[in-house]
């Protein structure tokens, strides 16, 4: 193996999302919207059971919720997990059925962007925005629309522009100056409804 190849392998790093940390950040951000009184009934949707990205995101969400429960012993905090599917129609059916059976659900956490379909279910049923808190991962048009409508309160942005841009910059610095690359966690960008107008403008420029 050549010296340059050895150097390249020694500086190999990752630019992307730490799934567990991102899930934790999502739940922590959403906790700011939890009702101040009464029981809290949380539902965590694992869209792809057995797949690392979904399981670890869910693990991060549940880690925070368990910590929250331990810190609020004066409140009833219930945490459930469900296979919520990776299809908007299926997610809507499964979570819609769950909400029918459990109308006192406080919040639903998705490990992808499929909570957008749950928002539509709530709207179609005449449920007011914020009655069931919603949050998930990735910025897609459906999610941004539901954030503007008030149904989705928190979303994790993987910041794909940064995922593409930063590795190129690090490769350039390694090649020109011999600088060692670093791991970059791009996946804990928290987006709330107030951010949507700016994001939509930047999306038109290919930056978000």
Model-identified regions with their sequence ranges:
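Hinge/cleft segment of the Venus flytrap/periplasmic-binding protein
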Residues: 49, 53, 64-68, 159-208
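Hydrophobic alpha-helical
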Residues: 61, 80-146
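Hydrophobic alpha-helical segments within soluble ligand-binding/sensing domains
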Residues: 14-41, 56, 91-92, 139-143, ...
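Short, solvent-exposed amphipathic alpha-helices that sit
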Residues: 22-29, 52-75, 94, 117-118, ...
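Flexible loop/hinge segments that line or gate small-molecule binding clefts
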Residues: 1-21, 32, 41, 45, ...
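Sec-exported extracytoplasmic/periplasmic mature domains
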Residues: 28-36, 62, 66-70, 96-104, ...
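Solvent-exposed loop/turn segments at secondary-structure junctions
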Residues: 5-8, 36, 48-52, 84-87, ...
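Short beta-strand elements in bilobed, periplasmic/extracellular small-molecule ligand-binding domains
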Residues: 41-44, 62-88, 187
């Amino acid at each position: 193996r050549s010296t340059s190849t050895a150097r390249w392998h020694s500086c190999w790093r990752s630019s992307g999302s730490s799934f567990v940390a991102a899930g934790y950040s999502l739940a922590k951000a959403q906790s700011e919207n939890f009702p101040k009184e009464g029981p809290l009934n949380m539902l965590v949707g694992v869209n792809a059971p057995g797949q690392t990205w979904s399981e670890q995101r869910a693990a991060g969400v549940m880690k925070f919720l368990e910590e929250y429960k331990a810190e609020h012993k004066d409140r009833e905090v219930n945490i459930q997990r469900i296979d919520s599917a990776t299809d908007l129609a299926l997610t809507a059916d499964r979570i819609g059925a769950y909400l029918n059976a459990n109308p006192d659900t406080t919040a639903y956490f998705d490990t992808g962007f499929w909570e957008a379909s749950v928002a539509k279910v709530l709207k179609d049923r005449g449920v007011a925005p914020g009655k069931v808190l919603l949050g998930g991962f990735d910025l897609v048009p459906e999610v941004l629309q539901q954030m503007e409508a008030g149904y989705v309160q928190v979303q994790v942005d993987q910041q794909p522009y940064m995922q593409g841009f930063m590795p190129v910059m690090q490769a350039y610095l390694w090649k020109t100056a011999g600088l060692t690359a670093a791991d970059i966690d791009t996946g804990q960008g928290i987006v709330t409804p107030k951010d949507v107008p700016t994001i939509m403008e930047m999306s038109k420029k290919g930056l978000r």
